[in-house]
C-alpha cells in the first residue's frame, strides 16, 4: 500500500459532497493532481455505504473545464453495468493556504470532489499481477474483453458520442461481484475533426501527448498530417492493444531495444509489418482471437470495425447468440421523455384542432341547392335519375373532380371537354329533335341559364335569330365551355356549314366586310361605355404602311423601344407605386378580314389592283408607336433593285387561273379539285414525266 502524501486527508475526516455526507476511511492512490480515497457515504448508494472519493486540485479554469467534461461524461453514463457509476460531485474555490504540493500559484485554484462507485476487487492490472505464472486463459480473456467492449460501445452510443481516448488495462476496475468496469473519463472528448491549419495541429498534438498513453496511441494520433479525425476508431485501436496485452502481458509494439518515444511511434506507424504474435507454451491462442486483434490494429481507421461489430465477434467467440443492448440508460430515458412530451403535444394539438374543426366544419341546417329539382328537365329527355340508396360502386383512384358516374360504371372526364356527359348527351338529343321547349319552372337550372343567355344575346344585338337558335347557342356554350363569336342571322343550315368551313380555313368570320362593319357599329352603339381607341391588327397596320405614298410616309424612329430605359428615376418610382390591378377597357369586337383569294369580290379587287400601283390610305390615322413627323429632305430613299424575271418554264399558273380551274360550279364559293384536274396540272408542269 502506497504511503499517503503530507497533504492527504486523514482517516475520519468529514466532508460534504453534494447531497451526501462523507467520512474518509483510507487513502488509496494518487495520480497527477488527484488523490483517491475510500469513504462512507450517507445516504447509501445502491445499498452500499462504501464509495470512492476522488479529490482533484485544479490550477486553472481551463483544467477545471476538462474536469467538468469528466463529470458530465460519468453523469451521462450513469446506470450502466460495465461503467463505474457516478454518485455525486462538488466544486469550490481553493485559497493559497489549502493548496496541495509545494508549488504555490498566484492563480485562482479550484477543488473538485467526485464521488464514485467503489470496486472492492481493485483493478484489472492487480488481477493480472496475481496471474503472472498461470496466465489468463482464452476463455477468461474473451469474458473480460466482452465486458469492456460493452462499456466502450455504450460510450460511443451517447448523443453526441463520447471518445474515451485512454483505454488501457489500468483503467478497468473489478467490483465485489467480479464485474469488469471501465473508469477514468478524464481524457474523454467528443468527436475531434482533423486540424485545418498548423496552429490547430500543434494544439491537438499537445493535447494528445498529455491525455493519452503512448503504447495505446493509434497511428492517426501520431501522424496528424494524414487528415484522419479522432473518433471511435481510435478507441478500437486501443481495444486491440488491450486485447493483445490480455493475451501476452505486453503491448504489441514495445521492443526491449527501444530507447526513445520516436522509435515506438515509428514502430506503430509501420504496424502492418511490425505486428507479431509471440506464441509460447502456455500462451497459444486460436486464429480467430488473433484475427480479432489484427482487424483492430489496422493502420487505416476506415478499415477497422466499430464497437458493435467487434462486440458481435467477441460474443460469437463466447458462445452468445445475441448481442447485448449497448444503448446507455441516459439515452433511453431521454428518448422516453421526448416521446412522452411529443405525445402530450400531439394530444393537445389534436384537441385544439378538433375544437376548431368542429367550429369551422359545422354543417348548415339547409342545403342551398335542395330546391333545384333536376328531374323535371331530365325526365323530358328520357333520362332517369339513379336512386340515392344505390349500391356503392368502385371508384377509380383519382380525385373526386376527375370522374363521374353514368349509372353503371365510373367514367373519367376527358381533358378536352370539361362538361358532364349527361349534359352533352342531352344537348345532342335536343339539337337532333329540332324542337323548342318552354320552361315554366322558375327554379330550374336551365331556366336560370336561359335567362343569363338572353341577357347576353340582348347585349350583342340579335339580328333576327330565333329563340330556338339562341337556345341552341347557349347550350352549346355550356357544353363546350367555349364562346360563340358571331350572332345567328337566320341563315340556312347549308350556309352555316359553308361559313364554318370557311372560318376553319381562313381563321376569320363567315360575314363579308360590309356586314362585319355593320355588326361592329351595332356593338359600338350597344356598348357606349368603352371609350378606348380602336386597336389595329398587325395585318391592317402593315397594309397601311404598304399603301402610304411619299407625302404620307411616316418617318421611322426608335421611339417606343426605349420605354423601359429612357425614363427617369421619378418615373421608375411612379411605375413601382402604380397599382397592378387596373380596369380593363372593353375591346371592340370585329372579325378579321377575309383573304382576297377566298372572298366573293376577289375578281374586282384583282382588277383594281392591276390598274392602280399606289394604295392610298383612306382616312387612316398614323400608328400610335410611330412619330408623325415629316421625313427630312437630306434622307433619300433608294428604290429597291429590279427583280429578275422568272423563266417561262418555271412559272406557275396564277391564283386566278388555279381558282378558275378548280371551280366546279358557280353556286359554291369553295370547291375542291378532282382527279382529272390534278392530272392536267401535273402534265402541264412536268411534261417529261408523263
UniProtKB/Swiss-Prot annotation:
Its main location: cytoplasm. One of its GO terms (biological process) is filamentous growth of a unicellular organism. Gene3D superfamilies: Transferase(Phosphotransferase) domain 1. Residues 478-537, 579-690 are annotated as: Disordered. The keyword Phosphoprotein applies. One of its GO terms (cellular component) is actin cortical patch. The keyword Transmembrane does not apply. It comes from the Eukaryota. ATP binds at residues 28-36, 54. PROSITE patterns: PROTEIN_KINASE_DOM, PROTEIN_KINASE_ST. Pfam families: Pkinase (PF00069). GO terms for molecular function: ATP binding; protein serine kinase activity; protein serine/threonine kinase activity. InterPro entries: Kinase-like_dom_sf (IPR011009), Prot_kinase_dom (IPR000719), Ser/Thr_kinase_AS (IPR008271). Disruption phenotype: Leads to increased caspofungin sensitivity. Protein kinase involved in regulation of actin cytoskeleton organization and endocytosis. Phosphorylates the endocytic protein SLA1. The CDC28-CLN3 complex phosphorylation of SLA1 enhances its further phosphorylation by PRK1, weakening SLA1 association with PAN1, an activator of the actin-nucleating ARP2/3 complex. Plays a role in cell wall regulation and required for oxidative stress survival. Belongs to the protein kinase superfamily. Ser/Thr protein kinase family. This is Actin-regulating kinase PRK1. It comes from Candida albicans (strain SC5314 / ATCC MYA-2876) (Yeast). The gene is PRK1.
Amino acid at each position: 500500500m502506497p504511503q499517503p502524501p503530507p497533504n492527504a486527508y486523514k482517516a475520519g475526516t468529514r466532508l460534504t459532497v453534494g447531497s451526501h455526507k462523507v467520512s474518509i476511511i483510507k487513502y488509496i492512490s494518487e495520480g497527477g493532481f488527484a488523490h483517491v480515497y475510500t469513504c462512507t457515504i450517507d445516504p447509501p448508494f445502491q445499498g452500499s455505504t462504501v464509495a470512492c472519493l476522488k479529490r482533484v486540485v485544479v490550477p486553472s479554469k481551463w483544467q477545471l473545464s476538462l474536469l467538468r467534461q469528466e463529470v458530465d461524461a460519468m453523469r451521462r453514463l450513469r446506470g450502466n453495468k460495465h461503467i463505474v457509476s457516478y454518485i455525486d460531485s462538488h466544486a469550490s474555490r481553493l485559497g493559497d493556504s489549502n493548496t496541495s504540493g509545494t508549488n504555490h500559484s498566484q492563480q485562482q485554484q479550484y477543488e473538485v470532489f467526485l464521488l464514485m462507485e467503489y470496486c472492492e476487487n481493485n483493478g484489472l492490472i492487480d488481477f493480472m499481477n496475481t496471474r503472472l505464472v498461470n496466465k489468463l486463459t482464452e476463455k477468461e480473456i474473451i469474458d473480460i474483453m466482452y465486458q469492456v467492449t460493452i462499456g466502450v460501445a455504450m460510450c460511443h452510443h451517447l448523443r453526441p458520442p463520447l471518445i474515451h481516448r485512454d483505454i488501457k488495462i489500468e483503467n478497468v476496475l473489478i467490483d465485489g461481484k467480479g464485474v469488469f468496469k471501465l473508469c477514468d473519463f478524464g481524457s474523454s472528448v467528443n468527436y475531434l475533426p482533423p486540424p485545418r491549419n498548423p496552429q490547430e495541429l500543434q494544439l491537438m498534438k499537445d493535447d494528445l501527448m498529455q491525455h493519452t498513453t503512448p503504447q495505446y496511441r493509434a497511428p492517426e494520433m501520431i501522424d496528424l498530417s494524414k487528415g484522419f479525425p479522432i473518433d471511435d476508431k481510435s478507441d478500437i485501436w486501443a481495444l486491440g492493444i488491450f486485447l493483445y496485452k490480455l493475451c501476452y502481458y505486453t503491448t504489441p509494439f514495445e521492443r526491449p531495444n527501444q530507447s526513445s518515444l520516436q522509435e515506438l511511434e515509428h514502430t506503430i506507424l509501420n504496424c502492418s509489418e511490425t505486428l507479431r504474435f509471440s506464441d509460447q507454451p502456455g500462451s497459444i491462442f486460436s486464429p480467430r482471437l488473433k484475427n480479432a486483434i489484427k482487424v483492430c490494429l489496422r493502420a487505416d481507421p476506415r478499415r477497422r470495425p466499430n464497437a458493435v461489430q467487434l462486440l458481435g465477434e467477441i460474443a460469437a467467440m463466447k458462445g452468445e447468440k445475441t448481442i447485448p443492448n449497448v444503448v446507455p440508460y441516459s439515452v433511453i430515458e431521454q428518448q422516453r421523455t421526448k416521446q412522452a412530451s411529443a405525445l402530450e403535444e400531439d394530444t393537445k394539438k389534436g384537441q385544439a384542432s378538433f375544437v376548431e374543426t368542429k367550429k369551422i366544419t359545422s354543417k348548415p341546417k339547409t342545403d342551398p341547392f335542395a330546391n333545384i329539382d333536376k328531374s323535371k328537365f331530365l325526365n323530358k329527355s328520357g333520362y332517369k335519375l339513379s336512386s340515392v340508396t344505390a349500391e356503392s360502386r368502385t371508384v377509380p383512384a383519382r380525385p373526386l373532380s376527375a370522374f363521374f358516374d353514368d349509372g353503371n360504371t365510373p367514367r373519367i372526364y376527358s381533358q378536352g371537354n370539361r362538361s358532364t356527359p349527361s349534359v352533352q348527351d342531352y344537348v345532342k338529343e335536343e339539337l337532333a329533335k329540332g324542337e323548342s321547349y318552354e320552361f315554366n319552372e322558375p327554379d330550374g337550372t336551365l331556366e336560370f341559364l336561359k335567362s343569363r343567355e338572353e341577357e347576353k344575346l340582348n347585349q350583342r344585338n340579335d339580328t333576327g335569330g330565333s329563340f330556338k337558335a339562341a337556345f341552341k347557342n347557349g347550350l352549346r356554350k355550356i357544353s363546350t365551355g367555349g364562346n360563340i363569336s358571331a350572332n345567328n342571322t337566320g341563315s340556312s343550315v347549308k350556309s352555316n356549314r359553308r361559313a364554318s368551313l370557311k372560318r376553319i380555313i381562313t381563321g376569320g368570320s363567315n360575314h363579308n366586310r360590309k356586314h362585319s362593319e355593320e355588326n361592329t357599329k351595332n356593338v359600338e352603339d350597344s356598348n357606349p361605355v368603352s371609350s378606348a381607341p380602336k386597336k389595329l391588327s398587325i395585318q391592317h397596320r402593315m397594309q397601311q404602311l404598304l399603301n402610304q405614298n411619299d407625302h404620307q410616309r411616316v418617318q421611322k424612329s426608335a421611339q417606343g423601344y426605349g420605354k423601359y430605359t429612357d425614363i427617369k428615376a421619378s418615373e421608375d418610382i411612379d411605375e413601382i407605386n402604380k397599382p397592378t390591378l387596373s380596369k380593363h377597357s372593353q375591346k371592340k369586337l370585329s372579325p378579321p378580314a377575309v383573304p382576297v383569294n377566298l372572298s366573293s369580290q376577289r375578281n374586282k379587287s384583282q382588277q383594281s389592283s392591276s390598274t392602280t400601283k399606289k394604295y392610298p390610305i383612306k382616312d387612316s390615322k398614323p400608328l400610335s408607336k410611330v412619330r408623325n413627323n415629316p421625313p427630312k429632305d437630306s434622307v433619300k430613299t433608294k428604290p429597291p433593285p429590279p427583280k429578275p424575271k422568272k423563266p417561262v418554264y418555271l412559272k406557275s399558273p396564277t391564283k386566278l387561273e388555279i381558282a378558275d380551274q378548280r371551280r366546279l360550279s358557280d353556286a359554291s364559293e369553295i370547291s375542291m379539285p378532282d382527279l382529272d384536274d390534278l392530272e392536267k396540272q401535273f402534265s402541264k408542269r412536268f411534261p417529261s414525266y408523263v
